[in-house]
Amino acid sequence: MSDFDPAEPKSGNPDRRDFLGGLAAALGAAAVAGGAAETAEAKPAKGSSSRPVSDAKLRAAIDTVVVIFAENRSFNNLFADFPGLQQPLSEVPAERTRQRDRDGKVMEKLPKIWEGLVPSKQVVEHTEYLIGPDDLAPIPNGPFALKTPEGDPLPHGLVTRDLVHAFYHNQMQINGGANDQFVAWGDSGALVMGHYGDMRAQLRMWQIAREFTLCDNFFMGAFGGSFLNHQYLIAAQPPFYPDADKSPAAKRIAKLEGDDPKGTRLKLDPKTPASAIDGPAVFGPNTLSPDFWAVNTMLPPYAPTYELDAAKPGYANADSAHTLVPQQHKTIGDMLSAKGVDWAWYAGGWNAALEGRMNDASFPSRPNFQPHHQPFNYYDRFAPGTADRAKFLRDGGEGSTARTNKFLADAEAGKLPAVSYYKPQGNLNMHAGYSDIDAGDRHIAAVIDALRASPQWEKMLIVITFDENGGWWDHVAPPKGDRWGPGTRIPAVIVSPHAKKGTVDHTIYDTGSIARFLTRRFGLEKLEGLKMREDAMLAAGGVAPGDLTGALDIA
């Protein structure tokens, strides 16, 4: 199973001048994320942008940076009442958590969980589970701890149903910062409001966070899903599809309310029920914006991918509506290479996918490789046969031991490059619908153990974070930014001998803060998208996102 849907989310490159012009226009658009909402009092995140640390001391302290990029969890979903939070969920007034229907009225109760909480039969700890839409009692309007029909905490080893997580949906759910229409514009009914209530004792990541630094104001860089947030991680901008209206992808261009191509609201299909109580909203295509930015999932132009060119080995089918044209704009990889800084993207299951083994017949499927989670594979600089592809795009192997996992083997041998991105294979990434919390949590804990035992540990900084919220609700209003984000709050843990110990860092960060840290530590040219985001947030009266140094204790 994959989170790529060749249809649309079922709720229901330009040259430098064009890039700067498009992003500059985005700054002028009204951002929906952090503005005061008419329907509820939004309580935005507050925090300083960074802690003063001299560049010289930073260079002396950190030689190796590792980014572990997991999948699809909001901050509340995993860390709702972690000790020391600025805005713990249990202290949020009920009126700030109530969801509003499509007509803007407060809902009397939440809908059923459409398709069921656990729609596929599974066995966890010798107990069989199959939890359908009618198996849970009516759920009051507000956040709730995920439980079985018997009232026990939902086992972390269960794969729940997936939730829609997409660019326009996320903005409509955030609703100007009120975060009160996650149910209305989601596709899973009540499930968006669920969280795991027993993490203190069960989640290994909690223990890692308690030892090091948890960031409680870290927001996903872009509204929406995995594809766009992986691109934001490395480029701080969406990909662009020139002349998309004349391309095979023409029918995937979004239809919005009004005539503004920079609009934020999808046009509703007439078949949409008036109330979310009666079923999910129905929308038309929305992969590309009307001005041709790729904002929802498209597939890479190169293998590994789902639709290959039979006549051109290593390449995708360019005539497919799902294939994105190769991109040319700058990424953090370009900036690192320009400075002579070694780096790599380790993709779990990469070689398996190239060999045709993306999945197996089990559930959850293994390794369940996700082509759209490999952001550098969209750029012509890394096309098949190039030296850069061979050097920088690496197979991460499979599993959680150095015998089978090549990233762990390099860590154990002290051979990681100065900057390493690690993307776990699909069944170990925590993505609802095809992965479970426990498998991903155990895997990340094993990775952290290996990194702490590495010869490179003493001068290492590790960022554990998630690409996006996966459709799950969070109560903290994202700061007002630019056209692309920031979106919903997500977890981030900073692990390092130089991280503050037992600390919750309240600094405002977004996914781009990782690139900001790399830019500062290695003296890189700054990506244009990072500058745009900083300018937009300052212009909105907020602070620019920090560069992660607020989580460090460097004397």
Predicted regions: what they are:
Residues 2-555:
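N-terminal pro-sequences and low-complexity stem/linker regions of secreted or lumenal proteins
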